[in-house]
Design a protein with these regions (language model features):
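Iron-sulfur-associated redox domains of electron-transfer enzymes in respiratory
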Residues: 2-153
Length: 153
């Protein structure tokens, strides 16, 4: 959290946050909002008031991941690649497979997780659109699982 606060207070930094859909749902339950309340809008407004320059939902990254995994499957099917294709957005599961099933690693999709894909888009496309050096973009991911920290670069 200290690094996030520091970035939010640095005028040179363009701070972007992405939030997993599960977090939005959990906030709605935690604050006992009735079903149908725009939790996403309230959360985005709160994050902007905290100083984030852009607020995104990770579901866009999930769409990118699905498209890339589909392309990877087609590529493997067309070129006698390793099957079955195993996909997972869970870094904890990937670590488990690396440790206990190294013989299956060729079956695991090479695609990034949704929050990694979205981070890559922010550091390239958004940086280009907003004319910001990618080194000045700080990407913050709010995820429901602590094992996502294994994916941080």
């Amino acid at each position: 959290m200290d690094e996030v606060k520091e970035a939010l207070n640095d005028p040179e930094k363009y701070v972007v946050v992405q939030v997993a859909p599960a977090v939005r749902a959990a906030l709605g339950e935690a604050f006992e909002f009735p079903i149908g309340v725009d939790v996403e809008g309230r959360m985005a407004e709160a994050l902007r008031r905290l100083g984030f320059d852009k607020v995104f939902d990770t579901k866009f990254g999930a769409d990118l991941t699905i498209m890339e995994e589909s392309n990877e499957l087609i590529e493997r099917l067309n070129n006698d690649g390793e099957l079955p294709l195993i996909t997972s957005c869970c870094p904890g599961w990937i670590k488990y497979a690396e440790h206990f099933y190294p013989d299956m690693l060729e079956n695991i999709s090479s695609c990034k997780s949704p929050h990694q894909m979205q981070g890559a888009i922010v550091k390239t496309y958004l940086a280009n659109q907003e004319h910001i050096a990618k080194e000045n973009i700080v990407m913050v991911s709010v995820m429901p699982c602590t094992t996502k920290k294994f994916e941080i670069t």
